[in-house]
A protein has these predicted regions:
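Contiguous, structured surface segment used for ligand recognition
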Residues: 1, 6-132
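Single conserved hydrophobic/aromatic residue that forms the stacking wall/gate
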Residues: 1-8, 233-234, 241-244
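Short secondary-structure capping/turn micro-motifs that flank functional sites
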Residues: 60-61, 172-173, 240
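Feature activates predominantly on carbohydrate-active enzymes
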Residues: 73-236
Length: 244
């Protein structure tokens, strides 16, 4: 095991100042890391209003560099984050590790407006203790929009989790389109009313329903995969099938 001094070290150096001339560099030809750089640029713009250019890495100053080094960290999902006056370097042994590194940088951005955005000089080594790190979303009992699910996945990504457990069916509703069996959604996605609170036999008397088309499911799975999140599809069988 490592002590805090092994994974987090403050450096005696001036901080890195984020500005409109800062650019984000990725390994030339690596499309996955180009997309990761685009994500980071978007996070910075959303939280600070600062526009940063995404380019192939040239090693120039005033840059945030994404570096792929298969030997950098023992864990395939680990990363090293080094902040200096000249640049910020996020080094991972995989594209996923680098993505998790930018989430740490993202969480270092101010949540309120500041005249100057700076990152203190520091070195961080971070790697997960558990291979499976997931969140569960039950849409069988309560239907959520695709927009909500994407926001949910964004939160999963922010916390360096790697699995989206998507609970798509239960007694209260069947939520995934199966073209060979259309009645699963024509009938099974709807219920005549919902239980109120925890009281037995108390219902609201309001029809309720909803389901996801196959294209919507594919879109969500792709959205998660772009953020290095595996979608674990949960269909309850043979029990909990009152909806069919």
């Amino acid at each position: 095991s490592r002590g805090l001094g092994d994974v987090y070290k403050r450096q005696k150096e001036a901080p890195f100042i984020l500005s409109t001339s800062t650019h984000i560099g990725y390994p030339e030809g690596n499309e996955k890391l180009r997309q990761t750089a685009v994500f980071l640029s978007g996070y910075i713009r959303e939280m600070t209003g600062i526009e940063t250019e995404v380019t192939a890495d040239t090693g120039s100053s005033n840059s945030i560099r994404l570096v792929l080094d298969r030997t950098a960290v023992s864990s395939p999902e680990g990363y090293r984050l080094k902040v200096g006056k000249r640049d910020i370097t996020i080094t991972g042994s995989s594209e996923a590790g680098i993505f998790y590194g930018i989430q740490t940088l993202r969480k270092s951005l101010p949540v309120t407006g500041q005249k100057e955005i700076s990152f203190p000089a520091v070195q961080i080594l971070d790697e997960p203790e558990y291979r499976y790190r997931g969140m569960h979303l039950d849409v069988g009992r309560h239907f959520f929009s695709t927009d909500f699910i994407k926001k949910y996945i964004d939160i999963i990504a922010l916390h360096n989790l790697n699995t989206f457990h998507w609970h798509l069916t239960d007694d209260q509703g069947w939520r995934i389109e199966i073209k060979k069996y259309p009645k699963l959604t024509e009938i099974g996605s709807k219920r005549k009313e919902s239980l109120l609170n925890d009281g037995p036999g108390k219902f609201d008397g309001k029809p309720y329903g909803g389901f996801y088309t196959q294209e919507e499911v594919k879109d969500i799975i792709e959205y998660a995969a772009e953020r290095y999140i595996l979608s674990l599809i949960h269909i309850s069988e043979p029990t909990r099938q009152a909806e069919i």
